[in-house]
Amino acid sequence: MSTDSKRYCIKTKHVAIICAAVVAVGLIVGLSVGLTRSCDSKDGGQGTTQSPSHLPPTSSPPQDQGVCPASEDESGNWRDFRLPDFINPVHYDLQVKPLLEQDTYTGTVNISINVTSPTQHLWLHLRETRITQLPVLWRPSGEQVQVRRCFEYKKQEYVVVEAEEELAPNSGEGLYHLTMEFAGWLNGSLVGFYRTTYVEKGQIKSIAATDHEPTDARKSFPCFDEPNKKATYTISIIHPKEYKALSNMPVEKEESVDDIWTQTTFQKSVPMSTYLVCFAVHQFDSVTRTSRSGKPLTIYVQPEQKHTAEYAANITKSVFDYFEDYFAMEYSLPKLDKIAIPDFGTGAMENWGLITYRETNLLYDPNESASSNQQRVAAVVAHELVHQWFGNIVTMEWWEDLWLNEGFASFFEFLGVDHAEKEWQMRDQILLEDVLPVQEDDSLISSHPIVVTVSTPAEITSVFDGISYSKGASILRMLEDWITPEKFQKGCQEYLKKFEFKNAKTSDFWEALEEASNLPVKEVMDTWTNQMGYPVLNVEDMRIISQKRFLLDPNANSSEPHSVFGYTWNIPVRWTNDNESTITIYNRSETGGITLNSSNPNGNAFLKINPDHIGFYRVNYEVSTWEWIATNLSLNHKDFSTADRASLIDDAFALARAQLLNYKEALNLTKYLKMEDEYLPWQRVISAVTYIISMFEDDKELYPMIEKYFRDQVKPIADSLGWNDNGDHLTKLLRASVLGFACKMGDSNALNNASHLFEQWLTGTVSLPVNLRLLVYRYGMQNSGNETSWNYTLKQYQETSLAQEKEKLLYGLASVKNVALLSRYLDLLKDPNVIKSQDVFTVIRYISYNSYGKTMAWNWIQLNWEYLVNRYTLNDRNLGRIVTIAEPFNTELQLWQMESFFKRYPEAGAGEKPREQVLETVKNNIEWLKQNRDTIRDWFFN
């Protein structure tokens, strides 16, 4: 599926002042929000075609208390979070009937169960859906067992079935059979089985589909909802005749039930985990390709958007064929479908044989979409294809090893796209997308290991984060480099063969790679998966290196929380000298560091440690070496690879932020930028310096100096590329980045161009160049937006059908420098007919990027927290993560407000880690400003 150790005290006399200030701020915000709501909300979106949706249900489905009432009975092992290992499903016969207009569905499931120990109770997962008839239970002999009662144990999301007598273990081939009838809602949520709507030729149409990962299959139907409870499925859907049904497997038969209903039954599936079960009822059109091995690869899409599925269809075929070759294993099912869901909570979901997508990640229109959209589609398509092997064929034993799914998909997606789009430099772009961003996350005390214990649905949901995905991908990249790509590939093939249709743990993967490489993979890699963080290597005399844990907070206790490895790592250190590249294993037991066996014994030539940032660590050279690097970048930056230029700058700014390097040395590296003309370094430079920019945004003395310096640095490349949307893929990405940075730094020429194009667009007669649209919407709105242009942009958002264009317009709307309009925009978040459920948190984040909206967005979250929890639930990871919009905060008052808010709502659900991380970050920001402002001011001043 496409993430705090210091204590801060406020002196007592300041508390009264702060309290008064907070009350005043709260009143002002509350009044402004209230006033603008009463004035503006009535005309939000008048006179436009509304994108339909539906509101959450006002109440839960009525409970049949006589069937399976809720109970606090804790007399059995259903008290435990995990299912017992002596009750295992073997096969599900599942029939579901959606009543689309009523927003409900009914169903029946018959589960064949293997019982290996005597028990009087069977329990399985169920949440929000209700049992409508007393369950029926049969022995392996076919004799019915009397059921005494059933009840829901809501604490662990179970339904418990109690038999009149003890069930003996079944022997031989015979199995118990449990039949349950159930009913549930199709509205109010983007998880489980749900309905959403879209417009076709002015008519509102419905589609119903499932989204089950990680623990939401239990919302659709009663099931043993753990990844190691694999079973086969025969699924049938009863649906209106004018609709079609899809599921994991091909259709076995379609039968008419009556004049209104058709029953579609699908072939029996291979053994799979509950979270991969999928079905959909739709009226879409399709585009099909055929794989080299003869498998149909079909994309289902709204009929009016059929042309936007062509690119995804082509990339699917190319990457699918590549992975069948690379993994030396044919795809396991007879077909592979993909479907674009109009309102979808995650980026995409790898359901076996029926992958579901958010529209932005599947549908690409070359005449309307940007190059970044095209790359996103390719990456997400490749990511979900990887899962058809890593995740579906071989599934992690338990969610603590989620990275075996997500880290692998995040790594191999770059190989897949690199195969299909060879000019995009995807093998290097992994630095921008995964390696360098997650190194920032993982340098906090509040990070977590890749392999982490989880024991609630909220904890499971919360590990779908940058550590599982991006750090997982990063260490696989390092591992592949160490043991060689050939042996890495062979090890992956052996792992897939050995655990086909089964579950595996991290240690199983290490074992497969050890057999393929004859190298101590487990000994090295356990230090990377079983403890959080990563090292910084300090280089002395150009050959002596020592390691220590890298933390952004220089005052943090680097031994906390406890790690069995003591925050030391076994490191495959790659280094180059005179164009020769070598790997030396730095054993963590060598506490005094190691000496590299360099052909340069005097240490007077540059020894590049970690070329192309292939290893998941940072490198700190002596000051004289950093000065040499800065000089040589200015003399001939092409002596360093594009990845090295990005890596050196990122390392330097991270080291300076952690007070391991003077900011003077880091900033000196940026002096060469007037000559830089490549995407990779520029994109990373912009990210690296954004921290400084955001910290000093409100500093009236320093910020203009920062703006002027970076404006001058970016001007040559911005002027050279200009505002014509031409060039290859990477040039288009580069242009969007540097022109955006020029606008952000207040370049009058860039801002005037953005405003001019924006004014032309407002006339309705000009189509903007696709790769400049986001820039124009953002900075045109920021520079010259008013109520008229804002209303026009909102109208365009509501009338356009392409999701990628909608997303850009949402960002434009969030960029207006007008508090009343931003307040009105925040009000629209509660109207799903205007802003889809999937986009609410995106909009809040966009508003927070606006200097006018930063505090407004945060205050809106606080004022509307209970509403958001009711709408999305505490288990929603997007809700959990939204608190991270406060990461740029850097005052004691802002910190106090955050801590007060978290105390008021202590239940964080999937937001537990994000809360820890944002508090740690804000505390670090406050301290950072005290420590670094003068140094940075002096550098820019001079």
Swiss-Prot record:
InterPro entries: Aminopeptidase_N-like_N, Aminopeptidase_N-like_N_sf, ERAP1-like_C_dom, M1_APN-typ, Peptidase_M1, Peptidase_M1_aminopeptidases, Peptidase_M1_dom, Peptidase_M4/M1_CTD_sf
Location (main, coarse): membrane
Catalytic activity: Release of N-terminal glutamate (and to a lesser extent aspartate) from a peptide
Bilayer-spanning residue ranges: 15-35
Ranges in the topological domain labelled Cytoplasmic: 1-14
GO function term, MF aspect, one: glutamyl aminopeptidase activity
Active site (record annotation): 384 (proton acceptor)
Keyword Transmembrane: yes
Membrane disposition: Single-pass type II membrane protein
Region Disordered, annotated ranges: 40-74
Annotated glycan sites: 110, 114, 187, 314, 367, 557, 579, 587, 597, 632, 668, 753, 786, 791
Site residues, Transition state stabilizer: 469
Superkingdom of origin: Eukaryota
GO biological process, any: cell migration
Regulation: Substrate specificity is modulated by calcium which enhances the enzymatic activity for cleavage of acidic residues while reducing its activity with basic residues. Inhibited by aminopeptidase inhibitors amastatin and bestatin.
Marked site positions, Binds calcium which modulates its enzyme activity: 211
Record's cofactor remark: Binds 1 zinc ion per subunit.
Matches recorded under Gene3D superfamilies: 1.25.50.20, 2.60.40.1910, Neutral Protease Domain 2 (1.10.390.10), tricorn interacting facor f3 domain (2.60.40.1730)
Residue numbers binding substrate: 213, 347-351, 877
Role played: Regulates central hypertension through its calcium-modulated preference to cleave N-terminal acidic residues from peptides such as angiotensin II.
Subunit and interaction comment: Homodimer; disulfide-linked.
This protein's name: Glutamyl aminopeptidase
Naturally occurring in which organism (per UniProt): Sus scrofa
Taxonomic lineage: Eukaryota, Metazoa, Chordata, Craniata, Vertebrata
Gene name linked to the record: ENPEP
